[in-house]
C-alpha cells in the first residue's frame, strides 16, 4: 500500500508539473503551448547497435592450410606424419613499431628467412594494440601471416607484457593491460586465425614477474596456483574458437622459472611452456645445473620453447660487428652453451631481436647488418653450433 501511495503522489506531482508547463504563455499573443503534441527528437545513429558485429573480425583464411599443421605429441611438437619438429627462429619487434619507422613489408620477412628462421615470434604490445586499434592491427598481422606462409615460416603470436597480470601491476606504460583486455585479445586472435596452420603458437603472456618476499612492492606477491588459473582461463578462451592452436605458458621471474610445474602443471592438454634463459639469470659456473633444475626438466614431459634470449659473441671465424646488449653480449661461452643445452633437451628456440633498437639486437641498422649476436644466431639456425 505504501508503494502504491508513493506512486500516486509521484503521479500527482508529475501531472502538476505538466499542467504548469502547459499553462505558460507561448510568447505569441498569449496562446498556450501544445506541450502534449511535441515529439522527441530523432537521434542520428551511425548504425543499429543490435546489428553491429564489428567486434568479431572475420576469420583470416588465406593460405590457411598451406603449411603442415603442427600439434603436440607427448613432449614434442610434431607434423601430421608424427615427425618431431625442433623449431629454430627469431623474434621481430612489434609490427606497429616497424610500420611507424617505415620498414614494414615483405622484404623484412625475406631478411628473416635468410637468417634461416623456421618460426617468427611476433610481439604485440598492449599499448600498440590499443593505439592502432583492432582492425588496423589485424591488417598488419594478416600481412605478416601471408608473408610467412609464402616464405614457409610459422608464426608465434606473443602478448608482450611484463609484470603481474593477476594484480594488474605491470613494469612500464607500454606493458599496461588488464585481465579483460588480455582475455579479449586472445579471443580475437583465436577467432581471427581459427584453423590457420601458419599461426601455430599463442604465447599467452611474455614475462610474468612478481616480487619475492622482502624485495619490495613493485609487482606484488601472486601465488602460482592463481597464475595457473589465469592461464587455464586463457587456454579455454582460445580453445573455444581455435582448438588446433598451441598455447604457450610462461613462469615467473620474467619467464625464467618453471619450477612450480613439477608439482602443479597447467591443467590442459596440447600446450607447451616457454622460458627466457638469458645468461644473467644464473652465475656462469651454475648454468647447466640451474638450467636443468629451473626449466630443463619440464622438457622431459612437456614441449618447451625458449622464446627469448640472446646477446651472443660472434661464432668462431666470424668478424665481430658489435652489438649484443642485455643478457650476456660478448660472453663467448654463453651462446654455444645455451644452444647445445636447448637442442640436447629437444627444446625449440627463438632468439631476440631482429631490430637495431631493442637489445640484445641481432642487426646493427636497418640495412640488416648482422652484429656479433646476429652472426651467431644465423650460424645456430644453420646447425653449425655443435
Where are each of the predicted segments found?
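Feature marks short, surface-exposed loop/turn motifs that line or immediately flank catalytic pockets
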Residues: 94-96, 126-130, 163-165, 208, ...
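Aromatic-lined substrate-binding rim segments of carbohydrate-active enzymes
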Residues: 104-166, 181, 227-242, 331-346
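Bacterial N-terminal signal peptides
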Residues: 8-17
Amino acid at each position: 500500500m505504501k508503494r502504491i501511495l508513493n506512486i500516486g503522489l509521484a503521479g500527482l506531482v508529475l501531472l502538476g508539473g505538466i499542467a504548469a508547463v502547459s499553462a505558460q504563455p507561448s510568447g505569441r499573443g498569449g496562446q498556450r503551448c501544445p506541450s502534449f503534441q511535441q515529439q522527441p527528437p530523432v537521434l542520428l545513429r551511425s548504425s543499429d547497435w543490435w546489428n553491429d558485429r564489428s567486434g568479431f573480425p572475420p576469420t583470416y583464411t588465406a593460405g590457411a592450410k598451406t603449411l603442415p599443421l603442427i600439434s603436440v605429441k607427448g613432449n614434442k611438437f610434431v607434423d601430421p606424419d608424427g615427425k618431431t619438429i625442433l623449431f629454430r627462429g627469431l623474434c621481430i619487434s612489434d609490427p606497429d613499431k616497424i610500420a611507424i619507422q617505415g620498414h614494414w613489408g615483405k622484404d623484412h620477412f625475406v631478411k628473416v628467412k635468410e637468417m634461416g628462421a623456421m618460426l617468427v615470434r611476433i610481439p604485440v604490445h598492449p599499448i600498440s594494440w590499443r593505439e592502432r586499434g583492432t582492425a588496423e592491427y589485424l591488417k598488419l598481422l594478416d600481412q605478416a601471416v601471408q608473408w610467412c606462409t609464402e616464405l614457409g615460416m610459422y608464426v608465434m603470436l606473443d602478448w608482450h607484457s611484463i609484470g603481474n597480470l593477476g594484480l594488474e601491476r605491470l613494469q612500464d606504460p607500454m606493458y599496461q593491460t588488464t585481465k579483460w583486455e588480455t582475455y579479449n585479445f586472445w579471443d580475437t586472435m583465436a577467432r581471427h586465425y581459427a584453423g590457420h596452420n601458419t599461426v601455430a603458437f599463442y604465447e599467452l603472456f611474455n614475462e610474468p614477474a612478481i616480487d619475492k618476499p622482502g624485495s619490495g612492492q613493485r609487482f606484488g606477491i601472486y601465488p602460482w596456483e592463481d597464475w595457473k588459473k589465469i592461464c587455464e582461463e586463457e587456454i579455454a578462451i582460445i580453445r573455444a574458437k581455435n582448438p588446433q592452436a598451441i598455447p604457450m605458458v610462461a613462469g615467473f621471474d620474467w619467464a625464467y622459472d618453471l619450477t612450480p610445474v613439477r608439482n602443479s602443471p597447467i591443467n590442459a592438454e596440447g600446450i607447451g611452456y616457454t622460458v627466457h634463459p638469458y645468461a644473467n639469470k644464473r652465475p656462469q659456473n651454475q648454468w647447466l645445473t640451474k638450467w636443468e633444475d629451473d626449466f630443463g626438466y619440464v622438457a622431459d614431459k612437456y614441449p618447451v620453447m625458449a622464446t627469448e634470449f640472446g646477446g651472443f659473441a660472434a661464432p668462431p671465424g666470424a668478424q665481430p660487428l658489435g652489438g649484443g646488449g642485455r643478457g650476456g653480449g660478448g660472453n663467448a661461452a654463453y651462446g654455444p652453451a645455451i644452444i647445445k643445452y636447448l637442442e640436447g633437451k629437444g627444446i625449440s628456440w627463438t632468439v631476440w631481436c631482429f631490430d637495431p633498437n631493442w637489445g640484445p639486437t641481432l642487426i646493427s641498422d636497418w640495412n640488416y647488418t648482422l652484429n656479433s649476436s646476429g652472426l651467431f644466431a644465423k650460424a645456430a639456425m644453420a646447425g653449425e653450433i655443435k
